[in-house]
Amino acid sequence: MGILAALLLFISVLLHELSHSLVARMKKINVESITLFFFGGVAGIESEDLKPSSEFLMAVAGPLFSLVLAGIFYLIYIFDGNGVITAITFYLWQLNLILALFNLVPGFPLDGGRAFRAILNAYYKDLKKATRIAAAVGKIFAGILVFLGVLGMFTTTGGGLWFVLIGGFLYFIAGVSYSQVVIKDILDKVKVKTLMRKNIKVLNGEMRFKEFVNKLANVEDNIFLVDGKLLNAALVQSVDGNVKLNQLAVSIKNLKVIGSNDTAYKAFKLSGESGGAVPVVERGKIIGIVTEGVLMNRLAWELKFSGHKGLHQHKKIKH
């Protein structure tokens, strides 16, 4: 019975998250991934540039669906006479109700916080400000959870630890979420062509890897052009020294690439998938490279002199 109840709870959480995705698809917003947690989940969408109305509908879809599930399980609980089914539905209607109410708290990154941000964004016409306020509320809520958890650890049998863990997690995610919006706001204003490096060293594709290592062991640069393809030495694993460089280099069609007029934020998002270097391509040819180091330096400079509120020293985050 316990396994069945746990399975149904997992399905409930999954359906909660899928409801977000369903609304996103209806709004023609691409959902890249769904990550589940024990108190809900996160639907990874392709863009943060959402209309407030779209974000609001996406946000409330999950809690509303959980409320519907809670109602269905409650009706089964009060009308079904089977002992096993009654026990399971009693457990499920309460947990779905808790899931819905918890996620309706107006603190980012919970669903209620996203809905709250959408309302603020519609009012202020400023996503960064809306996120800062919603994230601040999220941190306050997270702090309350941690406080209750610590209190519970001294007054109960230790169940308060879960509150501490959930509160700490929410506090961290609230901060990261605001950081991501600030990063996008900064780097969206910068064009790739102002940051890209054009002078990429060209190597002969017939050169053997062992010769490459001997000649360029002390060269700080890891990015090279080989027969029109890109060689990122930092990504090369253990290989036979007799392998030719043109066998290690990667063609444009297999790379994540950007154009010179694209934003630095697009390069920032791709840098994690490209070994820290994103090739800039025009008319089918590599004309430059944007490195993660250059992006981070520009970001650090902007953060130092632009005075963004509520943002502490930034560390690289998953994007």
Tell where the protein language model's regions lie, with residue ranges.
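Alpha-helical transmembrane segments and adjacent TM-loop junctions that form the membrane-embedded core
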Residues: F90-I183
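Divalent-metal coordination cores built from histidine and acidic residues
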Residues: K27-E32, D49, S53-I85, Q94
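Membrane-interfacial segments at transmembrane helix termini in multi-pass membrane proteins
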Residues: T157-K201, G205, F305, G310-I317
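Short glycine-/small-residue motifs
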Residues: A233, I286-E292
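Small-residue-rich helix-interface/hinge motifs
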Residues: M1-E55, Y91-L110, R114-I119
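Cytosolic juxtamembrane regulatory segments of multi-pass membrane proteins
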Residues: K125-G138, V192-N214
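Helical hairpin unit composed of two closely spaced alpha helices linked by a short loop
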Residues: K229-L235, G241-Q247, S251
